Amino acid sequence: MIERSLAGRAAMVTGGASGQGRAIALALAEHGADVAIGSFLATHGPAAAEEDTYLPPRADLDAVCHEIMARGAGAVGCDLDVRRTDSVEAFHAAAINAFGKVDILINVAGVCAEQAVCGHSESLWLDIIDTNLNGYFRTTRACLPAMIERGWGRIVNIASTAAAVGAKDNPAYCASKSGILGLTRCVALEGAPHGVTCNAISPGFVNTKMLRASVKRWLAAEGNKRSEEEYIASIAAGYPRKSIIEPEEIGAVAAFLCRDESSGINAQDLTVSTGALW
């Protein structure tokens, strides 16, 4: 039986309707936290052609809320655009209205796109930075003051091994993830005297619909000479355990960082890559 170590806590999870966000939301609920999830939904229309992302339908958001409630926790689901301050504030208000507070903030929402620096679209650059980095700032700005006032809080930011390693033709994504590490450390130092921690998790490749969107594009670039599973297996071959990361593994790490007993872990970047060091 899972210990309800987060009972009485309330969480906000961006990107919570799918992938890592969903896995983290369910892990928090398993440990007793009420969870508000926000995602940019497919009702806004298709994602930009050059971006690798997954826009969930409203049904996915509702389904995750039902999964949270099935674990004995409260749930709220919202359409969320982290590029807009008013959308972030509405999501925060919905969580406060439902649970009375936000103790835990998990920032997951993000997009990816590949373009070389030479000729890189400025609008694409700005959109990736605005989503992946500025979005984390906006949610943190909304949640941090009350955490400090109450003397307890946990913020977990999903970064990426791309922040440290870099990736060819992926400057905006890598820059945004590096920026997340800097933001994480600054927030950690601001919150530390008040019982608030802020840490980052940097996964390698995670088995999500967003990854598979990238794989489809990579396969097309090489002429679709192999299947998605064959391509993912080729990625996994470079990992020490010969498999990529599952979303639930990220959920477990995030839930651990939110425990009372994790208060000494602050301003850290935890790599989850099965030991791959590149």
Predicted regions and their residues:
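C-terminal substrate-recognition "lid" of short-chain dehydrogenase/reductases
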Residues: 137, 152, 243-272, 277
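Substrate-binding pocket helix/loop in short-chain dehydrogenase/reductase
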Residues: 116-117, 121-129, 235
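Residue(s) in the substrate-gating loop at a strand-loop-helix junction
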Residues: 160
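Short, small/polar-rich loop/turn modules that mediate ligand/substrate recognition or access, typified
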Residues: 192, 197, 265-267
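Alpha-helical segment proximal to the catalytic Tyr-Lys
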Residues: 145, 189-190, 263
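Active-site helix of classical SDR
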Residues: 140, 176, 184
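Canonical Rossmann dinucleotide-binding motif of NAD(H)/NADP(H)-dependent dehydrogenases/reductases
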Residues: 3-42
